[in-house]
Design a protein with these regions (language model features):
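Flavin-dependent oxidoreductase catalytic cores
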Residues: 1-177
Length: 177
């Protein structure tokens, strides 16, 4: 059903079609049935999706995310993670991500980018806007109260998204946007 919606957008003349909120880790949901690119086994399904969009005259662009503090994962018994302790719109309180977790998430972004390319997507988009999702929350001085290499100065707060971009670039071909 979801694919049909995006194919109709492509048929309507869109140059590219962004499928939003494609998570790098299915344990951290953003919305009810979050689309994910966190397993190699999902590539064939995404390939069919990307092919349908391409056949309709467009390119599929997954917006790769980790919902971080906006995760809806309480029903799974998982505490949302973020740069610092914050309360999300659902009233869930996130805990600060450890350096080890941050490094794992960076790798997950790179793998998701590789999977998107393998599936024939036209590129990827990374969500880091308005203090939302994990990278955006790290950028925000209001949400990021860390005092390590991922907090404090703007250079440190930007470190996560810059490392994510670098990891994505390492995992895809030079001409994959």
């Amino acid at each position: 059903q979801l694919a049909d919606i995006f194919v109709r957008r492509a048929e309507g003349g869109a140059g590219y079609v962004v499928i939003d909120a494609v998570t790098v880790d299915h344990k951290y949901w953003y919305i009810g049935k979050t689309t994910a690119l966190d397993k190699d086994s999902l590539v064939p399904q995404f390939k069919k999706f990307a092919t349908r969009v391409k056949d309709a005259g467009s390119e599929l662009i997954p917006q790769i995310i980790h919902p971080g503090p906006e995760s809806i994962c309480a029903m799974k018994g998982i505490t949302p993670i973020g740069p610092s302790i914050n309360t999300n719109a659902n009233g869930d309180v996130s805990r600060p991500a450890t350096i080890k977790e941050i490094q794992k998430i960076i790798k997950q972004y790179g793998k998701a980018a590789r999977r998107a390319e393998e599936a024939g997507c036209g590129g990827i988009a990374l969500h880091a806007a308005h203090a939302y999702m994990l990278p955006g929350a790290f950028l925000s001085p209001l949400r990021n109260k860390r005092m390590d290499e991922y907090g404090g100065t703007i250079d440190n707060r930007a470190r996560l998204i810059l490392e994510i971009i670098e990891e994505c670039r390492k995992n895809v071909s030079e001409d994959f946007p």
